[in-house]
Regions:
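Catalytic core and acceptor-binding pocket of nucleotide-sugar-dependent glycosyltransferases
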Residues: 135-215
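The conserved acidic donor/metal-binding loop of glycosyltransferases
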Residues: 86-90
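N-proximal low-complexity "stem/linker" segments adjacent to membrane-targeting elements
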Residues: 1-18
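Short, acidic, metal-binding catalytic loop of nucleotide-sugar glycosyltransferases
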Residues: 21-30
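Short aromatic/hydrophobic "clamp" motif used to bind/position activated sugar donors
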Residues: 82
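Conserved donor-nucleotide/metal-binding helix-loop-beta segment in metal-dependent transferases, i.e.
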Residues: 91-124
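Membrane-proximal basic amphipathic "stem/tether" segments
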Residues: 1, 120-148, 220-268
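Active-site-proximal specificity loops/subdomain of glycosyltransferases
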Residues: 38-76
């Protein structure tokens, strides 16, 4: 049995609408969809049909909170495998859970740290080493908006790190990565259960997906592209007027900063 687990939040609901449509229209090989949202935001999922809705604890920083939800998703799912999906991912015609398997095993993509180390290696090796007590030989962040894991792996990870939620709450926003941690755990403890592939040594597998995320939300250009796959927004906007105003304010602030940065570059 294969579960799909999607961790969302109130500002991603418009994307989730399209993601769920694409799963039902295009993705083959799954048995259930579990949608997780922070406690207190359940009303934003009132238009979701034929999914199981669960809640996760509220974090001061939900960027870390959503990662912890994925690490602990074995508490919510029924399947013996779980496809963890970003809510802004769209599955295209021909998509199948089999896309994430090779020789019957979930595929884990790796990328060796360069020599000499680049900024990415310098940043992530000690962050991963802080949790594990040793540094990894490669990065495990390679992915396409969806990753397949065995439920037993998540259970084992949780047993090995029973205080991972408390640990996460103490970490800075950009010093926690659920997929770096899971990947290294698999590398150390369960390499026989997965196919670990270095992206520099093998051809890239074909994934029938596209990630449409845009800091400006769902633009007309994005809508036109999605319409080619018969995907159209179906849910009304669930954000409050205040949340909509805050989103617009952030967009204006970001564009203003970009404009000032472009001016400073021209003057240098």
């Amino acid at each position: 049995m294969v579960s799909i687990f999607i961790r969302t939040y109130k500002r991603d609901i418009a994307w989730l609408d399209l993601c769920l449509q694409s799963i039902r229209n295009n993705l083959k090989g799954w048995d259930e969809i579990v949608v997780c949202i922070p406690e207190g935001q359940e009303h934003h999922l009132r238009y979701a049909k034929d999914v199981r809705i669960v809640t996760s604890p509220v974090f001061p920083n939900d960027y870390i909170g959503q990662q912890v939800s994925k690490l602990l998703c074995h508490h919510y799912i029924k399947g013996d495998m779980v496809l963890i999906v970003d809510s802004d991912l769209v599955f295209l015609p021909g998509a199948s859970v089999q896309d994430y398997l090779e020789n019957g095993k979930p595929r884990i993509l790796t990328n060796k740290w360069p020599v000499p180390a680049d900024k990415l290696a310098i940043k992530w090796r000690p962050i991963i080493g802080k949790l594990f007590g040793k540094e990894p030989p490669c990065s495990f962040m390679q992915g396409h908006g969806a990753r397949l894991f065995l439920k037993s792996t998540l259970q084992s990870f949780s047993a090995h790190f029973p205080d991972i939620e408390a640990y996460a709450r103490k970490q800075p926003r950009k010093e926690f990565s659920e997929f770096q941690f899971l990947g290294f755990f698999i590398y150390l403890n369960e390499p026989q259960n997965y196919l670990l592939l270095d992206i520099n040594e093998v051809p890239m597998a074909q994934y029938h997906t596209q990630q449409f995320w845009n800091v400006d939300g769902i633009t007309k250009i994005t809508l036109d592209e999605l319409a080619q796959y018969n995907l159209h927004p179906q849910w009304p906007n669930t954000l409050s007027p205040w949340d909509q105003f805050r989103r617009q304010l952030r967009q204006v602030t970001r564009r203003t900063k970009q404009w000032f940065n472009s001016l400073s570059h021209k003057n240098t």
